[in-house]
Amino acid sequence: MREIVHIQGGQCGDQIGAKFWEVISDEHGIDPTGTYNGDSDLQLERVNVYYNEATGGRYVPRAVLMDLEPGTMDSVRAGPYGQLFRPDNFVFGQTGAGNNWAKGHYTEGAELIDSVLDVVRKEAEQCDCLQGFQVTHSLGGGTGSGMGTLLISKIREEYPDRVMMTFSVCPSPKVSDTVVEPYNATLSVHQLVENADEVMVLDNEALYDICFRTLKLTTPTYGDLNHLVCVCMSGVTSSLRFPGQLNADLRKLAVNLIPFPRLHFFMLGFAPLTSRGSQQYRALTVPELTSQCFDAKNMMCAADPRHGRYLTASCMFRGRMSTKEVDEQMLNVQNKNSSYFVEWIPNNIKSSVCDIPPKGLKMSATFVGNSTAIQEMFKRVGEQFTAMFRRKAFLHWYTGEGMDEMEFTEAESNMNDLVSEYQQYQDATAEEEGEYDEDDGGYGDEDDGMM
């Protein structure tokens, strides 16, 4: 079968990951001890995408948990599904990265990375036909960003032909957890551009807004935010795990969503999101799911798709519905909002339908979009980066771990290049395509003046 190895790193990644296994285990009818007590054969048919079957019919997640301090791991282990994981797959150091990307990437993380790779290798060897890796981490801290990107580049070397998908929590515009977030995030994006295949961009502020405005939660906790992320993660892989009329997998997703290799940063959305009180007042229909999916308020990262254009998008529906209706709706969206889609990619929405809906819903939809508006995220982080870097603020923490200022400069210009690439394709029209071909290598050059 097409297995996925799940890797979670750092506090944020571990907390999202722990929640993810609760959601997935619930879908497959696996209880916290790893025993199956579901009610349908379909739950078991492809359970081995995410689980290994151990002796005595126990199901063990294909998960690798890593952190540079034991704290979060202990709380995962003490959590509701803590006994599910294989004890050897917890890999942790004792020192912590202290929100320092250099510690995660070069010093502390580099010492621990080999033991993490051993565990990853073991998990990969137990797969029949490994499809790829999914990583949950944040870009603002030290471990998830520094060590996470180190691990991604190492896995890239060892498994160059496997899909590398990351769920990356980016720094929010208004809420900042760490002062040095812009540094850590920029250095991470620099790595993700080169080494990841698909990056799902999330950020806490957008998730808060969804919890607050749409779900009407007065005091959203991180648990609520993580639950939103996990529903999306589960939706993206649903057609691998359950039978469907129109299947999608990680590779198909990549092929349909990435027109140019560097532009692989996606937005996520999910429908139906309704507050607990008003659920029973609305009937779920394919048109309603579609319109909520494409709603800007529904995006799980702080970039407004109305400020850019979609290069490509993908909608994964779950539940009993006619594929004809899905296709009509997709066409409908493109025709009504044609100005928000680039015209030089004619059919830019991919859809897939999986027959089994998530627990407690009749039907649902997961949205993954490749929009040029995502540059807002990078622009914002880039501006904060430049402001601090110009004064060399906090730089001694990084150079003290053996980093060079040159690396910061490179990361900065790589991110600026990324922004201008998105901008270039946002402005491109079908007619003037010929103009780009001659000077295709040229558009990176004028950015280097931004230092």
From Swiss-Prot:
Write the record's keywords in alphabetical order, separated by commas. Cytoplasm, Cytoskeleton, GTP-binding, Magnesium, Metal-binding, Microtubule, Nucleotide-binding
Its GO biological process annotations read:
microtubule-based process
Binding-site positions, Mg(2+): E69
What cofactors does this protein use?
Mg(2+)
Which GO terms of the molecular function aspect are on file? GTP binding; GTPase activity; metal ion binding; structural constituent of cytoskeleton
- What does this protein do, in the record's words? Tubulin is the major constituent of microtubules, a cylinder consisting of laterally associated linear protofilaments composed of alpha- and beta-tubulin heterodimers. Microtubules grow by the addition of GTP-tubulin dimers to the microtubule end, where a stabilizing cap forms. Below the cap, tubulin dimers are in GDP-bound state, owing to GTPase activity of alpha-tubulin.
How does this chain assemble?
A: Dimer of alpha and beta chains. A typical microtubule is a hollow water-filled tube with an outer diameter of 25 nm and an inner diameter of 15 nM. Alpha-beta heterodimers associate head-to-tail to form protofilaments running lengthwise along the microtubule wall with the beta-tubulin subunit facing the microtubule plus end conferring a structural polarity. Microtubules usually have 13 protofilaments but different protofilament numbers can be found in some organisms and specialized cells.
Spell out the protein name for this chain.
Tubulin beta-4 chain
What gene name is listed for this protein?
A: TUBB4
